[in-house]
């Protein structure tokens, strides 16, 4: 009951924030990144790739945000900012003239409607492991929540090992697969998991 009320509160906040700031996500090409691990790294990699290509881009992670070239310590460190702050950042980026936004998206952010109203052009899934079950109850529920981002996006980017479990929910969707086994390469980032992050980016 309490959880349902919290969800309703966050949804109402998201609706009001979108209206107040004029649905700023519609003015941006938004790339959402979700997963259990590697969200912040992959979000940052995509941001740096687009920035290096001369594209006007901002990003928001659970650690910090870079909006219109200025860095902000969000202080969230766990989940997405509340909808009000999220929409405010999107509006600042759009008003600055940025064309792209890279957004780290947590399962709590999805289930609590914090990213409601944002039209995702691309949804990226890094990986899904057995975490956050205290909130989601079961792995199936957790995985399904993560897939919400990909099902809402125009293009879904997902690893081959997760695609089989997600195939039904992504039916009819444009899907881009990545597989570190088929694309061997070297990176200065340590750990095999960072190879997955690079491929996802």
Segments predicted by a language model, with ranges:
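Acidic, Mg2+-coordinating active-site environments of NTP-dependent enzymes
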Residues: 27-28, 95-99, 120-200
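Conserved helix/coil segment N-terminal to the catalytic DExD/H
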Residues: 108-116
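Short gly/ser/thr-rich secondary-structure transition/capping motifs
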Residues: 12-17, 81-84, 103-108, 138-141, ...
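A generic structural signal for short, well-ordered alpha-helical segments in conserved domains
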Residues: 43-47, 90, 201
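Short, basic phosphate-binding NTP loop
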Residues: 1-32, 41-55, 179-186, 193-195
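Short beta-strand-centered segment that lines the nucleotide-binding/catalytic pocket of NTP-utilizing
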Residues: 54-68, 106
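Residue-level signal for inorganic ion chemistry
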Residues: 33, 60, 86, 104, ...
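Conserved nucleotide-sensing/catalytic segment adjacent to the nucleotide-binding pocket
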Residues: 72-106
